């Protein structure tokens, strides 16, 4: 979406408001003028602690220092709609019925209908097209093309087994079988994690299957690591989409969300296992791993 906007309006300046953990990644996009970190998750976690309200007030004042021609909310959530309202500018977002949360949809000055049957990435692109009055048939461009994977020269498989949503987690027993299969193909396995729960899962799998648990990294550091990875296997998280954008060979495991609407999209080799209603068995994932490894 950001790449599209910059191509259509090369003189525009794009500021991106993003959860603070993702700020290092957004800074890597060449079309972004300024990254504005927000700490909604941390504020929720530490709500009531000393200094939080002052931090929120300072953030709100800072956000209102600039006036924008358009404030475009591509999330369609109540929290993102509130942040849009705090900003100075004409708010544009998904209309009720199109937005992920109905109350968000009624809050924007300009409400745009976009089919909920489209993939989420394409929905965001279409929202920007309608908001800014252009049409594009160009392929998706994540703005990370200069970081194309060196996967073929690597013997590392990276595992994304954690998720903030428990419903998206895959069985530890299944993970162990898949990791042993990958190791039999001569790959070294590395685990990444973002929370203590993620780390606990990694440690359970590692205790049975081995592998290396990487230290906690910023997203920009993880991008560098991913660019030299032969294979990624992961559940439905933002990290899975990051791997797809970097064209790393990817196996995406689904079971509680719809891959037709939120699945990985990229120009590299991708195998999707599972569906919106059922997780794959480990044999399906090992077959996919064999296919991708034989490609290169």
Please name every model-derived segment.
Residues 1-296:
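Catalytic machinery of carbohydrate-active enzymes
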């Amino acid at each position: 979406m950001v790449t599209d906007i910059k191509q259509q309006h090369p003189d525009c300046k794009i500021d991106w408001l993003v959860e603070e953990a993702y700020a290092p990644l957004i800074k890597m996009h060449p079309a972004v003028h300024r990254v504005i970190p927000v700490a909604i998750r941390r504020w929720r976690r530490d709500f009531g602690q000393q200094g939080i309200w002052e931090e929120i007030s300072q953030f709100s004042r800072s956000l209102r220092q600039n006036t924008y021609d358009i404030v475009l909310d591509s999330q369609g959530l109540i929290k993102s709609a509130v942040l849009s309202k705090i900003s100075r500018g004409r708010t544009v977002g998904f209309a009720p019925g199109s937005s992920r949360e109905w109350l968000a949809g009624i809050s924007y000055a300009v409400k745009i209908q976009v089919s909920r049957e489209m993939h989420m990435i394409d929905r965001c692109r279409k929202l920007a097209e309608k908001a800014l009055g252009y049409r594009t048939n160009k392929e998706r461009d994540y703005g990370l093309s200069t970081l194309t994977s060196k996967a073929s020269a690597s013997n590392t498989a990276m595992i994304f087994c954690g998720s903030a949503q428990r419903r998206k987690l895959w069985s530890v027993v299944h993970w162990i079988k898949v990791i042993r299969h990958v190791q039999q193909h001569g790959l070294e396995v590395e685990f990444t994690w973002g929370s203590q729960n993620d780390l606990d899962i990694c440690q359970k799998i590692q205790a049975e299957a081995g592998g290396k648990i990487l230290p906690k990294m910023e997203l920009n550091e993880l991008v560098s690591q991913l660019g030299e990875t032969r294979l990624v296997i992961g559940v439905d998280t933002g990290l899975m989409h990051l791997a797809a954008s970097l064209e790393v060979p990817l196996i995406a495991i689904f079971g509680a969300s719809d891959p037709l609407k939120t699945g990985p999209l990229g120009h590299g080799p991708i195998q999707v296992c599972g569906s919106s209603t059922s997780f794959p068995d480990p044999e399906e994932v090992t077959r996919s791993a064999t296919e991708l490894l034989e490609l290169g």
